[in-house]
Amino acid sequence: MSDTEEQEYEEEQAEDEEAVEEEAPEEPEPVAEREEERPKPSRPVVPPLIPPKIPEGERVDFDDIHRKRMEKDLLELQTLIDVHFEQRKKEEEELIALKDRIERRRAERAEQQRFRTEKERERQAKLAEEKMRKEEEEAKKRAEDDAKKKKVLSNMGAHFGGYLVKAEQKRGKRQTGREMKLRILSERKKPLNIDYMGEDQLREKAQELSEWIHQLESEKFDLMEKLKQQKYEINVLYNRISHAQKFRKGAGKGRVGGRWK
């Protein structure tokens, strides 16, 4: 049975149903009498169903219609499945391409990071080399300056030592307090060069100077106490000598007076 015949058959069935619907309200009288005799039903009365008329001389193959509908549904389902798998395949390809791009970008970033690290390492090495070169030049310059200063100080020390020798020759072996102070300062005074020192070395040097100052203060205190003791002893001896000289002067006058008598 072709599609045209199936369509004609469906149109005939529709016409028969319309005819049945038109013929159904032609029997109102018995229904109206029943409605007057008894109360109205709770639900409407369904008209009797009339089977569709099958045209004579033509046999309808329902199995063929069902088979065609199944084939059509199967074809649509197969089309949907094919579209779904095509879409899924496309999405998988896009996902694989996205993963490849991510891995490629990650590798590029790692390469760029490695390149930057190497550049930074080279820059740090150049800076360290330049710093070392400058430190060597500064150390060499400081050494030259120290040598010049030492030479000047040695010359000054020689002249100062000659001056002290001359002063000693003039005054003999006795030295004044000023001369002794100058001599001791010239022996103890040393040049302090801290330009080349780092933070730790400066801290150690400061600790050393602090201990040295503490030692000097201690020695100064001891010397001051010793000086006080010596002054006290000198005063005591001076008083004794003065007292003894008074008695000696009185005894001398008596003897002289005795002679005169």
Swiss-Prot record:
Record's compositionally biased regions (Acidic residues): 1-30
Subunit structure: Interacts with TPM3.
Keyword Phosphoprotein attributed: yes
GO biological process: negative regulation of muscle contraction; skeletal muscle contraction; slow-twitch skeletal muscle fiber contraction; transition between fast and slow fiber
Keyword check for Phosphoprotein: yes
Tissue specificity: Expressed in soleus muscle. Isoform 4 is predominantly expressed in fast muscles.
Biased composition (Pro residues): 42-54
UniProt biased composition (Basic and acidic residues): 31-40, 108-148
Entry function: Troponin T is the tropomyosin-binding subunit of troponin, the thin filament regulatory complex which confers calcium-sensitivity to striated muscle actomyosin ATPase activity.
Keywords: Muscle protein, Phosphoprotein
Protein name as it appears in the record: Troponin T, slow skeletal muscle
Gene Ontology molecular-function annotations: tropomyosin binding; troponin T binding
Family: Belongs to the troponin T family.
Xref: Pfam families: Troponin (PF00992)
Signal peptide: none
Annotated PANTHER family: TROPONIN T, TROPONIN T, SLOW SKELETAL MUSCLE
Gene Ontology cellular component list: troponin complex
Residue span of region Disordered: 1-61, 108-152
Modified residues (Phosphoserine): S2
